[in-house]
Amino acid sequence: KEGADIVRTTMDQIACVIAETEEAAARARDLIRVEYEDLPAVFDPIEAMQDGAPQLHADAKNNILVHYKVRTGDIEEGFADADIVIEGTYRTSWQEHAYLQPEAGLSYIDEEGRVTVEVAGQWTHKDQQQICHALDLPPEKVRVIYPAIGGAFGGREDMSVQIVLALATWKLGRPVKIIWSREESIRGHHKRHPYIIEAKWGAKRDGTLTAAKVRIISDAGAYAYTSTKVLGNAVMMCVGPYYFPNVHVDAYTVYTNNIPTGAFRGFGGPQGAFAAENQMNKLAAALGMDPVELRLKNVLREGVPTHVGTPLSPGVSMPEVIEECARRAGWRQEGENWRREKPPQPENGVKRRGIGFGAGFKNVGFSFGAPETANAIIELRGGAEIEEVILYHAGADVGQGAHTVFAQMAAEAVGVPVEKVRVVASDTATVGSSGSVSASRMTFMAGNSIRGAAEKALEAWRNEERPAIGNYTYHAPKTSMFDPETGHCYPNFSYGYVAQAVEVEVDVETGFVEVLNVVCADDVGKAINPQQVEGQIEGAIVQAHGYALMEDFQMRDGHVLTQHLSTYLIPGVLDVPRHVESVILEYAEPNGPFGARGMAEMPFIPYTPAVAAAIYDATGVWFDSQPMTPQRLVEAFRKAGLGN
């Protein structure tokens, strides 16, 4: 294929060795000699955008994969109306998914002659499509099966071992197995995008927001992956869940020779929120205004237009979520004013306590005009009464408990105990596509497809069909892409809403931050399985904790330096917050199944800026980059005259 002879990143695969043993494969690998012609490379996205920079792809001038613009109102007039202007440049880093099970898979020829790949992934039919494209095979010759596994977080959204497995079995006609080591996993799959966000906000003395000007640069790495979709989310979230009459955004995702970046829990939301919520907290401090009160003064409500010219989809609960989180965290409402006392301080002046607040919203589904569908088949078996319900669904279970929730929703839709439901899942040979298990979409999409299939199956049952089968494909409400000039669009059909209060204790001499308490209010629409919802909230907070304070992914000239979990530190049991209060709110999503909306990504989004605000509350020092490691904190504290 055109361009396939160019190595653009250390993640590119050069050769495939298949052997009977690992030792034989290693010996064969060591015999390979590759002749390279060195090409110029670029690793900084700002440098990559300049004229004369090395070009990674012929169709991307100045290495710009995409440029999104938003032009709403009159930005100059908005700043002229402002009494105060807050500016900041925010930088976020790569993040490794660090799921406990590294990439692995098995391939073979099944009884119908299909190349069959059993692997962990997030979209069976997309994996099938990409294998077919790579091997030039028709879909009926390729089968993909997903076993349930313990984690993905977006890291299994793109190709890893799937095509290599299929290629080996297709060529040899034999079963093939592959298991990546941890080092191979860290080097071999995409990461969360690093972002540079320059933000300038204007507001009146009473806290009314007047203008926001934002410039975003995202490092896509060497290939596109999901970078354009991640950037779209960041554009939506870079001004937070707040109303601005005047907005000017320029957002770019840029090719570099770094390893590719792609889907990761939050999908652009954490990067956008880090800038937006820091701006909001800085504005509150500059105005001498409570951060909760300032948010409630400007928060998006039902029918209020966003900065892309259209309101959020029906079912907006952001004000209620902020209020409930604040109350649970000790804020008091006095008329329109909100207040919270500063946490009591330790007697030892070395350690200081503070509390920070953050809010966020996140789309459910890819949206931005992408067609969103999910297929389900329900088969009812029995005689006079329904004795068994078989649900066929392609949705993957990647540790979030999707298949349990599928069974619960099928039982509710059919009207039988959940014990009568059997789920046949994640096999391209049994059911149509469900779309990706990502973007917090699967409960919403699967639930609606399951309800539709149940209605059809029950109708067939009433017509005396045995077995009674219902086959239904749900189509989500239509959305639209950014207008190329104004950015105006109807980007998403559903949203989830979250707010967090984080209390920390900071040691100004060592830079160590201990998170004492987290209150997380999350509107889930309807908690189909409350235990799983609570687990998702706590899991997202732990993962966000690593992003905020610990996980320092390092790359130099495209080479990953932190290839081991001994050098890339993720939270352990002694690192996580002491206490997490999960506040599960249920404001029904009008289009959601049983009122449910997606929720698993949302608790990640406001955590890092809430931690930054808590550190500021404790020490008076702002941090505009993450991770906020002890070394970086100590350096900043010393500059501020804190500690030794």
What are the language-model segments listed below?
Residues 267, 441, 585-603:
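Amphipathic, heptad-repeat alpha-helical segments used for oligomerization and assembly
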Residues 1-521, 579-583, 611-618, 622, ...:
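Structural alpha/beta core scaffold segments of enzyme domains
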Residues 531-567:
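Active-site "cap" helix and flanking loop/linker of ATP-utilizing ligase/carboxylase catalytic domains
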Residues 525-529:
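Cytochrome P450 core scaffold surrounding the K-helix E-X-X-R motif
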Residues 422, 572-596:
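Generic long, charged, amphipathic alpha-helical segments
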